[in-house]
Amino acid sequence: MEDRRIGVYVCNCGTNIAKVVDCDAVSDFAKKLPGVAVARSYKYMCSNPGQEMIIQDIRELSLDRVVVAACSPRMHEPTFRKALQTAGINPYFLEMANIREQCSWVHDDARAATDKALALAHAAVRRVVHHEPLEKRFVDMCPATLVLGGGIAGLTAALELSDAGQPVFLVEKDDHLGGNLARVDLTAPYLDSARDMLADRIRRVLESPKIEVLLRSTLQSLSGFVGNFRAEIRVGADGARTVDVGSVLVATGFREFDARRIEHYGYGRLPNVVTSFELERMLREGRILTRGGRVPKYFAMIHCVGSRNPEYHGYCSRVCCMTALKYGHEIKSALPGAYVYDLYIDMHAFGKGCEDFYRRTAEMKTMFLMYAKGTTPEIVPSGPDDDCEMLIKVHEVLSGEEIEVPADLVVLMVGMEAREDAADVAHLVSISQDKDGWFIESHPKLDPVATTTEGVFIAGTCQAPKGIPGSVAQAEAAAARILGKISRGKIEVDAVFAEVDETRCSGCRMCNELCPYAAIEYDAATKRSRVISAVCKACGCCVAACPSGAIQGRHFTDRQIFSQIEGVLEWASSQG
Amino acid sequence: MAIRANPRLVEELEHYGAEDVAKCYHCGNCSAVCPFSREPFLFPRKSMRYLQMGLEEKLLGNLEPWLCYYCGECSEECPREAEPGETMMSMRRWLTSRYDFTGISKLFYRSWKAELAAILLVALLTGAGFLLFGFRWGGGHLGVYAGEGAFLTTGAVHVFDWILGCVLAAFLGINCARMWWFSIGKDRTLRIPPLAYLRQAFLLPVHFFTQKRYAECGKKRPWAIHLALMLSYTTMLVLIMFFLHAMHSERTVWAAHGFGYLATIGLLGTSIYALRGRIRKEETHYKHSHETDWIFLILLVFVAGTGILQNVLYRVFHLDVAANVVYVVHMMGVVPMLGLEVPFSKWAHLAYRPLAMYFSELQAEAIRERERAVAAAGAPLPA
Amino acid sequence: MGVPKKIGVYFCQKEAALPMPVDWDAVAEYARGLPGVAHVEVRSPRPAPDPEVLAHEIKKRDLKVVVVAGDSPGHFKPAFTRAVALAGGEPTEVRLASFRQHGAGADDGTERAKAVVACAVHGVPFGLAASPRPTAVNPATLVIGGGVAGIQAALEIADAGQKVYLVEKTGTIGGHMAMFDKTFPTLDCAACILTPKMVAVGQHEKIDLMTYAEVQDVAGEPGAYRVKVLKKARFVDPDACVACHACMEVCPVAVPSEFDGGITTRKAIYMPFPQAVPNAYLVDAAACTYILSGGKKCGACLRKCAKELIHFDDRDEVVEIEVGSIVVATGYDVFDARRIERYGYGVHPNVLTALEFERLTNASGPTGGAIVMKTLRRNKRTKQDEWVFDAEGPRPGSVAIVHCVGSRDKKYNPYCSRVCCMYSLKFAHLVKEKLPDAVCYEFYIDMRAFGKGYEEFFERIRLEEVFVVRGRSAKVVEKDGRMTIKGEDILKDRLVEFPVDMVLLSVGLEPACASDRLAGILGIDRDEDGWFRETDYNIDPTGTERGGIHVAGVCQGPKDIPDAVAQASAVAARVLKSVVSGRGQGSRASLTVEEIESRARALAGA
Amino acid sequence: MGFEPRIVGFLCNWCSYTGADLAGTARIHYAPNVRVIRVMCSARVDPTFVVKALAEGADGVLICGCHPGDCHYSEGNYKAMRRFPLLGRLLRDYGIEEDRVRLEWVSASEGKRFAEIVDDMTERVRRLGPSRVKTLLEADRVER
Amino acid sequence: MPEKKLQIALYWGAACGGCDVAVLDTNEFVIGVGFLVDIRLWPIAADGKYRDVEAMADGELDCTLFHGAIRNSENEHLAKLLRRKSKVLVALGSCAHLGGIPGLANQVTKQEILERVYLDNPSIEAGNRVVPLPSTRVDAGELEIPRFYRRVYRLDDVVPVDYYVPGCPPAPEQVKAALQALVNGTLPPARSVIGASNRTVCDDCRRRKEEKKVTRFHRPWEILQDPDRCLMEQGILCAGSATRSGCGVRCPDSGMPCRGCYGPAPNVIDQGAKFVSAVSSIVDSKDPREIERILGDIPDILGYAYRFGLPASLLQRSIR
């Protein structure tokens, strides 16, 4: 260690640093530190001459470590790393001391600032001694993708990938493609044909030579890591397939809320209380009748069935309002003399064209009745003189009145909920679920399709309730991620990651659950944990937690940080 | 007890001009911008709501439409163009038809052809009647307009006026009584002490003659126009009912005629202004016109025009024959206008609106009293 | 094919349908000539089709298949479905031929409509028969707009190893998101999640970042566009500038800061914000004394810059680039609250728009995140009194937040801006967090808390004792010397008048002002509200009729950050797909009716 | 000269270090007593680092991470949050004053907050006086 | 058979004598040892005087097994003396290695100890307030007793140590192995830990390990434990993961958690801090109050974390 040849470069940043920090004092001080071969102070280290100076010194003085005391590493670390690389030494042999943003710009006492700069420079010198050469590595990327779920999201992603020439295995539990959308006839707000858009996609998928569709199939197990997954799939009753894939897209969709759970709506008990999907079928078949075979006159849509109610699901299912409005239009088209009521809480008509659709539904004299969140309308039998099957009683909040409306057909706008097998899927592909059972994305804002498991993506309603455009966009976004990885052929693994020293790991599994990216694998046979470096994001959580010191985080090793601690303090104690 | 909603009412109200009420999504903007809306009468949103839901009973007892003077601010600010102002107007028409026990009003509002036919019929009957009277029974001459031997004697006309007036007052009185019943009488929860009726009675003439509430609107011109029209009309009514002799005298009685001319000019001017407004549709409250509005305005212009024409013909040009003919024609306008418009159509509001001001004050007082009682009893106020 | 089916084609229109450049009679005539068509009927808007009458007709004519054609034929489909069912037919044999959905809004509307009808008659989805011919594709991509959507799309494409030109109008990337304090519903800090992405863009070797630049002209065809980009003079070399602030400190000019929503000022030589990418200064030529005086006055910065990087002789330059795909991510402008006079914006000093409040409450804002009222202060330079934010200023004791300002309103923007409910709730939260004693009112119409975790956030706000008033407030007035907000509390059946110290207007989103021009340059459509039109609302929310040009983010329609990001990534998929496979997507406009019809015929036979 | 505390700061790269940089770009002045060591995430801060710093003579240790829910690594800061109470108790048992070690959340936009925290901490540590750890350890040292 | 028997000494500093018992627990082996070595000093088993040791030539002893910590001047003196006389000095057991249980006294001051033992102790007769002093004047002259130090040291703190055999007490087999290596001359390079593994107790623990998420900590007697499952996962604070193995997993095998007597794993500098880090990492909550509650179940964290090694920790002692 003592024979290190360290170069220390103190940037004046014009006067930005030099105005407050005595840069020459810093370089003079550094010169005397053990291992320091050269120390210089210069006007602009980041400028070309500045970088040239470093490069030249590395070559001529055979420096093997470099410290730059300048601005924040967040600004110029890449610049100087490049300079080291140009000079022919490992770019990670660099350490920066931030004496601008965190020193000269925030202090006006020149002495104190210079002291601080000295301490920081000292720490950097101490640290850089322990820097190790790190290389970016690459792992293979298998171009095939496993898509779970043959609904609109799965179909879209499969098509995007296969159109780009990449193989896809599309696994669908059912015996046909289309998922929940196959049950829908028209879509809100433009009343376009869902059937056409599905027919188009299904046909393309089936005709694509790159897509292998596995119907009546389920994923049995998934092993490996990004770029190198192996999936076992059960096909049909007793077939089995093992496929190697580089990425997995989970697009398993949703299931509808079971309206039976809200007993007082009487679904399953009252003949003319139906779910939205049942009305959808009536409309699609052109047979809109009560159970008794009568053409209904009064339709009541009850919104938020199972949604926005803490007893069932606290969240909004996002599409039901627009679907109910759509039914309003459809009913008036199929039965021009019918009356439609919408019993709603808040009208969620937020998409493109949706507010307009809402307005037009209102213009068609759909009667909107607002009930309060936390309450529910009540369905009661009609009297002998009524010309309807049932009456709905509701505390209507916009008028403040208790009112009743006649109804022949009550339509329960059932919300979406996570599928019953979501937990199994989550476990198989090691992703997490939120409290409602939806799969959790890597970052709600900036990474809505990735998961914390590298190489596993989610799209569509398995992530959260959403409409068709949202599902399609997400599916394509996931395809973009996958294509991005495939198109580079290899997966670049950052040089900085955590690694387990297997000779020291005792398999205590303390770390296993800590990694948000599931980068830590436990091998039951050897009783050792292992960090999949391709998946690791180098946060260092496991490093800090490992009670046996078996995990080390590259470029942020205990050794390096200890030296830094000693560096900032030792100097200070000797000076002050 | 739950009230039954009726999806058909909103369809029915279309006949009365409420075409856009279904568009309302209840943002509450209108009630808040309305210069007249104040507790406990929050309108127009709430009335719109009752209408959307078809709560007929609620609407029938609702005086709020009468508290609205259609200044148009609500409609201007409505984000959905649901035309709350026009909806209130339509509700006034509907209420008029409901107060009217004969059902004639309903017929007129639902069919402008029926109204027009009725007007023509009454006009023809009136014309025929006056001609018969003039030529046969009155003993006058077509060549004499005023004084001795006049074609239509003042006395006879005066008697006719009073008979007509009494008939109209009877109709209107019954309708007003119905209005009271719907809005106050039927509601058992409202306790109004008899004295309160007396105490607040001053509101009737005040609102009748000043429409002072209209003046609370941000824009003053509509109020001024309306006031001019109302005062002109009232002046004319007083002149005709009480000073017909003076009006009819051979010489010009400026004390009467001065007012007469002023009132006629007022009537003509304001109604022409209103007609022009309804054609141009620049002002919000003129944007939507029901057929009955046109009929009424045309009648008004016609009556005022013929009224002044006969005067001018007689007094300026001394053309007695022409004046008499115009007089008959004038009466053919006046009688249907008064006979049909006052009890059964638009003109009824001259009675309903001051009454509504009066009743609503009584209601408000009773509501406040009830709330005070509830508060005193310690029960929580409705949130 | 066997015996041709008896097909009936019904042209139906709604009264309110938009005027479309379609000659219906010509299309009807064309439909008559299609195989199997037994009956063609152009229906007038009124009366609406009566299923029972239709059933009778269908039975009489023995139609086996019904094609409903028109702008939005879905509106009539249930009637026809029921009619066919009543007539004993197969309800699945009712097909739609939607002109609007399939882009018959362009100049060749009639031709497109014919093709749409032909596909429906053949029973082939239009998208299948009319998929554009693939083109060769230049692997480079142009991304227009450096907001979060543009950044995401650029990174996504560049990370896959493809060249990207990112053109941004202002001096830095970051867009609106960089201005935000927290993002709903997780309340994570916008800068924390955005700046790493911005830095990544700035440092990406595959991204050619052109800030302070505008697209001037686009020529060529899908897969091979030639784009002229106007690079406005920055007057400071962004690569060499070390962001030392020395120049800014001496600049005597102060103009409203765009980044701070106008609530603070910046200099004529400025960096939009401290984390700007590129992290360098630029000169606002419209404000700089030196430039305006032709070099006769000032020049203080010139003398101050130790690196001598300020070059006032810089000129705008036009560069031409060649790209295969273009991603449009130009974002939005916010609604100008001055347009609604009754809210008193611009009259009452403490009526703020959402963006202003974002900056006020931002830790990097003028008050360090303290929520204060504006106070009157004399400007030493102009000798005038000004309303300014001062970190030590008085804290508002009551704040009202008004939803839907400019949105859901036929007079302004009829559409829902989609994000305001949530950001308003966020504001309420921030107010309660920073000023626990402050009274906070929210005036809303519908609480559109529809996304993941949104409803829970709304519940949380309620627990924080924010007064949530259902009823959009009507106006802000001065009453007894205090600002007062008036509205109807619908659920409580009261007219309310709250004296408030501060009013926040939740202004909606509007298409960016230049989007009209850009649509012209790019040859893409805008919808009636001004947003760029996508190929298909549902299944192609990012494509445009012009092949190789994609839309992402809010410029296609209001959306929140997750949706904008997802869409931006989706666009990247489209671009990467074409680059990886070498097959770009051509314009659909290049297909003729005959071609589509023959393809549909072939597909139907297959 | 009075006592100038020596404080070691462990700042997470994504929020707090960026926030500290922002304080710089915004020229927000604060006490020069904190010497920053950058870590990728507050979860990397091993309690050992804290005791090491104290043993080496630090008068205070400041740990800063992203606000809860904001972590660049989803939930690293929660791990820091979990470790802190137990570490605090450990230090208390050692007799080290509570104010010497602090865990704070600083976002990338909170340059001002960072400055305030540093000032406040410096002031509190200044009031506590120099840490006795190192002096005592040195005094205890036995000649071998 | 070597020509000359090995000369060894066994000595105890501040210790309980358990390590001696551990030596004896090697059973018949220790008798065999007797044939191979001369035990020159072993206070617990044989008579011997300090002056005999002082009389030895430097390096005369081949090896000294020193157990016990350094608490007073006598301990230090003998440690230094034996160091001088021995070729090889072995720190036997936790006390010599890390400070051991006596090291827990570093939580309090010398003053507090004296007060507690001699003044505040309930077993002390009322009025008896005698505190020993290093030197007392009696009729016979100046009476000296060893000086009581401010704190406890490890052996290593006062003399350079060649080998460390951890454990409280060291497992007899490990003692046996160490003695055997000594006799056979197969000792590893100096300054290393012998008689222990390079991994932690978990490596040898037979209990099933799964994923760790703890919402409540229990004392061992508070719950009915699953005998096959990791104690930590059951909420029993077990230091096994942070402790060198070699003990034979005696505690967890008998249903008690590991207390950490073998000291930190080779790469770990501060056993207690690492343990705190690991334990708190697996607390399953994101709510500060909840976290406090869960961790609140752990009593006396300093005692737990450094039960056998407080003087070996980075901070070594309480600064009160």
Per-region residue spans from a language model:
Chain B
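Hydrophobic cores of alpha-helical transmembrane segments in multi-pass integral membrane proteins
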Residues: 91, 117-132, 158-177, 225-245, ...
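Flexible metal-binding regulatory segments at protein termini and peripheral loops
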Residues: 1-2, 92, 96, 383
